[in-house]
Amino acid sequence: MADAALKRGPGRGRFVTFEGGEGAGKSTQIKMLADRLEKDGVRVVLTREPGGSPGAEIMRHLVLSGMGKLLGAEAETLLFAAARDDHVRNVILPALNQGSWVLCDRFFDSTRAYQGSQGKVAPDVLNAMQRVTIGDLKPDLTLILDVPVEVGLQRASARRGSGAPDRFESEDIKFHKGLRDAFHKIAATEPRRCVLIDATASAEAVSNIVWDAVRERLFTAVAAAS
């Protein structure tokens, strides 16, 4: 994260991350939350990982095309770390310091689940990469969208149509079930930061649950700080 620094205090924006397996509906829910926040006068920056900045988008292409997998699990994780470092320095921190709310489709919890739990990269390696790339930056709220693996993969297939599955969509069912378990464990381990949301309902119903969680967890905190 180099010399970038995160401001503290009431002028800082809020950082909300969306996590979950393939086809959980993260992209849809981020857009719906952004619309609601903007109607309330909140400045919002939408972003994603891997990607979100010009340099990180290059890394995204390398990873999702499958080229990173050819290098091995730890090397692939280094690509994610390089993308995150660029993304945090050039997009996330500047937006938060300017008072905007940052809504991010995936963050370090996905690295824990995908590369840690399923890629078998050692926890000490992941922790070292996390310290270097994000320092003490943590999401104010993480919304983990949960759907059964079969449902998520069906949604992902319908979304891409005739296109080929990406690097992670093409993994076997055991991999995806392991991912779901990993996200459940993250939610259970950090209940103050994470909210596990049943995302099998309609987009509108899930959006209402997301909105309730944001109001309860973050609007109260904003009011208390002001």
UniProtKB/Swiss-Prot annotation:
<dbReference type="GO" id="GO:0006233">
    <property type="term" value="P:dTDP biosynthetic process"/>
</dbReference>
<keyword id="KW-0808">Transferase</keyword>
<feature type="binding site">
    <location>
        <begin position="20"/>
        <end position="27"/>
    </location>
    <ligand>
        <name>ATP</name>
    </ligand>
</feature>
<dbReference type="InterPro" id="IPR039430">
    <property type="entry name" value="Thymidylate_kin-like_dom"/>
</dbReference>
<dbReference type="GO" id="GO:0005524">
    <property type="term" value="F:ATP binding"/>
</dbReference>
<dbReference type="InterPro" id="IPR027417">
    <property type="entry name" value="P-loop_NTPase"/>
</dbReference>
<keyword id="KW-0545">Nucleotide biosynthesis</keyword>
<keyword id="KW-0547">Nucleotide-binding</keyword>
<dbReference type="Pfam" id="PF02223">
    <property type="entry name" value="Thymidylate_kin"/>
</dbReference>
<dbReference type="GO" id="GO:0004798">
    <property type="term" value="F:dTMP kinase activity"/>
</dbReference>
<protein>
    <recommendedName>
        <fullName>Thymidylate kinase</fullName>
        <ecNumber>2.7.4.9</ecNumber>
    </recommendedName>
</protein>
<comment type="similarity">
    <text>Belongs to the thymidylate kinase family.</text>
</comment>
<dbReference type="InterPro" id="IPR018094">
    <property type="entry name" value="Thymidylate_kinase"/>
</dbReference>
<keyword id="KW-0067">ATP-binding</keyword>
<dbReference type="GO" id="GO:0006227">
    <property type="term" value="P:dUDP biosynthetic process"/>
</dbReference>
<dbReference type="InterPro" id="IPR018095">
    <property type="entry name" value="Thymidylate_kin_CS"/>
</dbReference>
<comment type="function">
    <text>Phosphorylation of dTMP to form dTDP in both de novo and salvage pathways of dTTP synthesis.</text>
</comment>
<keyword id="KW-0418">Kinase</keyword>
<dbReference type="GO" id="GO:0005829">
    <property type="term" value="C:cytosol"/>
</dbReference>
<dbReference type="GO" id="GO:0006235">
    <property type="term" value="P:dTTP biosynthetic process"/>
</dbReference>
